[in-house]
Amino acid sequence: MSIFLCFLLLLPLSLIFLKKLLPSKGKLPPGPKGLPIIGNLHQFGRFLHKSLHKISQEYGPVMLLHFGVVPVIIVSSKEGAEEVLKTHDLETCSRPKTVGSGLFTYNFKDIGFAPYGENWREMRKIAVSELFSQKKLKSFRYIREDESQLLVRKVSKSALETPTSSVNLRKVIFTFAASIICRLSFGQNFCDFVDMETVEELVLESETNLGSLAFADFLPAGWIIDRISGQHSTVMKAFSKLTNFFELVIDDHLKSGKIEDHSDIISVMLDMINKPTEVGSYKVTDDHLKGLMSDVFLAGVNAGSITMIWTMTELSRHPRVMRKLQEEIRAALGPNKEKITEEDLEKVEYLKMVIEEAFRLHPPAPLLLPRLTMSDINIQGYSIPKNTMIQINTYTIGRDPKNWTKPDEFIPERFVDNPIEYKGQHFELLPFGAGRRVCPGMATGITIVELGLLSLLYFFDWSLPNGMTTKDIDMEEDGAFVIAKKVSLELVPTLHRW
């Protein structure tokens, strides 16, 4: 009843806001008519990307919807995405501010959600220099290979001790990805002193609240409803847990004297924080450190593990592809290898096609991080005013029959002699985005995915648990911002005999 009264009180304010938003200076995109106050929010189901996909089938690849009183442009075509991310990259490379993104990035002191400007440029410079440069990628190679060997040992132990028992691949793969990201970013392997189930819970809870829609984001005085509904309290609890975890990691660096060795991003930034700053120069603070930790920890851990799990899921559903892939891998690498190295990644072309096909059907973030126009622009013949939010639906683009034959089927061979790849130059496939706001950790992320999958597919043969068929594999999704497989993938590993 109290929430209903809030809506009644907000109605006059909402009507005033609607009159001021999106002044008509030209032809606006089409879209479904919304309701007072809530706009089109009532048309969204559990998964926003699927709801927008369905609406786009009626209204086209460039639509105008209202999230509450906030106008949002939805782009669902390769051509529209190219205009936003390439033609008008500079004019659209800022970010809208939301409650969740502001909180979990410590007031936008990160790279991913920071509005375009000095803070974003400086933070990106630090991240690229200390984490994502080619030099750093090579220097961290031993960490990735160490963890891939540990992954193989864990699965081997299970295969030998309980030959007919299944392995929960979500847990195994999450630990693999989290261990790599935490070692190369934070200089610590949390497996040694933190329960990985707790870490997984923390990542999922933080990401869910980061990607959740708050009433305050889309309604004037919506913060009142957030507090009455309990949304504000839920988000704050998740944020508090994440902050406590980060402070534990930072305190460990301070106690162990790691600041001086500059071996990881935390020690580098702590040194920057402690050094005197010249007048007029950029000042790095504790919030900048935590903001960057949030980006790396949440996006780095979850996106990589989710892609690996969806890939193994599709391979399990398509035994022909699994057989073909494993035959190619083993023929290319030869028998009885003791370990997989990153040189081996250049020998397995079909694996790269399989991963690209998984990206097409299961992009980790089916809606790219929203952009905000910094000037009036024109997209596909429609006028888009300054300060308008733009969402690009890569889920729809990846299933567009104009770009893909049999778009709903898992067919890695579609990438044979096909120039399309995932690095941001081809707008049919955008798992990492494109333009100035492309994911800076793309090379690191894809290397982790390829190395982990290659290790699992070279050393083990995989089968479904007894009595289960490919039709029984559950494909239900879960998540808010990053979309994971809801039901854990359970497979039976058998050490391959040569």
UniProtKB/Swiss-Prot annotation:
Topological relation to the membrane, as annotated: Single-pass membrane protein
EC number(s) per entry: 1.14.-.-
Domain of life: Eukaryota
GO CC field: membrane
Alphabetic keyword roster: Heme, Iron, Membrane, Metal-binding, Monooxygenase, Oxidoreductase, Transmembrane, Transmembrane helix
Cofactor: heme
Residues noted as binding heme in the record, renumbered to the chain: 439
Keyword Membrane: yes
UniProt KW Kinase keyword: no
Entry's transmembrane regions: 3-23
Signal peptide per UniProt: none
GO MF term list: heme binding; iron ion binding; monooxygenase activity; oxidoreductase activity, acting on paired donors, with incorporation or reduction of molecular oxygen
Subcellular localization, as worded in the UniProt entry: Membrane
PANTHER family documented for this protein: CYTOCHROME P450 71B11-RELATED (PTHR47956), CYTOCHROME P450 71B38-RELATED (PTHR47956:SF6)
Assigned protein family: Belongs to the cytochrome P450 family.
Name of the molecule in the record: Cytochrome P450 71B5
Organism name: Arabidopsis thaliana (Mouse-ear cress)
Lineage: Eukaryota, Viridiplantae, Streptophyta, Embryophyta, Tracheophyta
Gene: CYP71B5
